[in-house]
């Protein structure tokens, strides 16, 4: 490569160009990564050498192991968690029953509602007379 002619001239008015800093080479993380990739390539552990099927199988195995660990963690619930789940289920059942009763009352014919109101007023009048 030819040397630029401004290097030979000792003109003090010229600003000498400085070599640009390569951020990739100065980055310590990038150097470590590059060194690791070179070592893996020499050993034959390069990720590009694996066939696609093998990559997919390894990913499935990893996913399976993770799923098994999560299931085991769920199975190992403490007594407190079990009791809380039971209470939550009971509360949900009570809410469902209340909703069913409300729906039945809303869907009931008008004469059934009036009959219930008459009974209540009759009972209230009877209690007021007894007092």
Swiss-Prot record:
Region named Disordered: 39-78, 100-131
Ranges of compositional bias, category Basic and acidic residues: 52-78
Positions of modified residues (N-acetylalanine): 2
Sites bearing N6-acetyllysine, chain numbering: 50
Family annotation (InterPro entries): FAM107 (IPR009533)
Coiled-coil annotated spans: 61-112
Keyword Oxidoreductase: no
Record keywords: Acetylation, Coiled coil
Keyword hit for Cytoplasm: no
Family: Belongs to the FAM107 family.
Protein name in the entry: Protein FAM107B
Taxonomic placement: Eukaryota, Metazoa, Chordata, Craniata, Vertebrata
Gene name in the database record: FAM107B
């Amino acid at each position: 490569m030819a040397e630029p002619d401004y290097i030979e001239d000792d003109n003090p008015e010229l600003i000498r160009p400085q070599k640009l800093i390569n951020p990739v080479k100065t980055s310590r993380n990038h150097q470590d990564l590059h060194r690791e990739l070179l070592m893996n390539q020499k050993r034959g552990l390069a990720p590009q050498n694996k066939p696609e099927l093998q990559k997919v199988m390894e990913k499935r195995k990893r996913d399976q192991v993770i799923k098994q660990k999560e299931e085991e963690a769920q199975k190992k619930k403490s007594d407190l968690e079990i009791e809380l789940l039971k209470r939550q289920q009971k509360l949900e059942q009570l809410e469902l029953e209340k909703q069913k009763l409300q729906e039945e009352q809303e869907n009931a014919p008008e004469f059934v509602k009036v009959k219930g109101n008459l009974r209540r007023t009759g009972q209230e009048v009877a209690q007021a007379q007894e007092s």
